[in-house]
């Protein structure tokens, strides 16, 4: 498997610092993943498969998916986060391929995955490459903040890191949308499950 990336030392150090300062705050999977797994992933792939976890950090989603019997590739810019993921995985580490690199210029390789997922990460320019990484018949799971988050406490405020209303469904153009929701439940988010046609 080969990926092509660029480098961003400032961003890497920012995330390294976040993981060092709060190492135990990154482990509970977002509730969207277990729900999407039972409603969409499991019916399509009852015997498991491979997944790509974008900006997977300390491994909360990759480890959960590995617990369900999946093989997962976790990519994150933070060496600290990825090392925490490796340690947090324990014996499940043999089912997770850990990659430290910048995602801002990600290029999909010939390797495709049954599931590609990203939680609270937004780099619009690489969205087409993320879609390419989904195998035919596979799923894209995505959840991140919307512009409404700028008015709430916590979370990102930079508009470059926030979705416009309806934008996530537009970014998934060419995929069949199975689930889409924008909500204000403590955080302003959009979530999507979309399938690449066979």
Predicted features and spans:
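Conserved beta-strand signature within the Rossmann-like core of class I S-adenosyl-L-methionine
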Residues: 138-148
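Conserved class I S-adenosyl-L-methionine
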Residues: 1-46, 48-57
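Conserved SAM-binding loop
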Residues: 85-86
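Conserved SAM-binding strand-loop segment of SAM-dependent methyltransferases
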Residues: 91-103
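A short acidic, Gly/Pro-enriched loop at the edge of an enzyme's catalytic core
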Residues: 108-115
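Conserved SAM/SAH-binding beta-strand->alpha-helix loop
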Residues: 78-80
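A short, conserved alpha-helix within the catalytic core of class I
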Residues: 122-134
């Amino acid at each position: 498997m080969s990926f092509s990336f660029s480098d961003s030392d400032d961003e890497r150090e920012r995330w390294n610092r976040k993981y060092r300062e709060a190492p135990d705050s990154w482990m509970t999977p977002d509730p969207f993943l277990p729900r999407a797994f039972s409603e969409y992933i499991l019916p399509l792939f009852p015997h498991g498969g491979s997944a790509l976890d974008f900006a997977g950090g300390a491994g909360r989603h990759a480890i959960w998916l590995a617990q369900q019997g999946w093989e997962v590739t976790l990519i994150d810019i933070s060496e600290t986060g990825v090392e925490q993921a490796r340690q947090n995985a324990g014996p499940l580490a043999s089912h997770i391929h850990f990659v430290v690199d910048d995602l801002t210029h990600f290029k999909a390789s010939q390797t495709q995955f049954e599931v590609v997922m990203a939680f609270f990460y937004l780099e619009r320019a690489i969205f087409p490459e993320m879609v390419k990484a989904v195998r035919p018949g596979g799923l894209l799971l995505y959840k991140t903040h919307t512009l409404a988050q700028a008015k709430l406490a916590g979370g990102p405020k930079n508009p470059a890191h926030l979705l416009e209303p309806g934008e996530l469904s537009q970014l998934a153009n060419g995929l069949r949308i199975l689930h889409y929701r924008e909500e204000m439940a403590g955080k302003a988010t959009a979530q999507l499950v979309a399938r690449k046609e066979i």
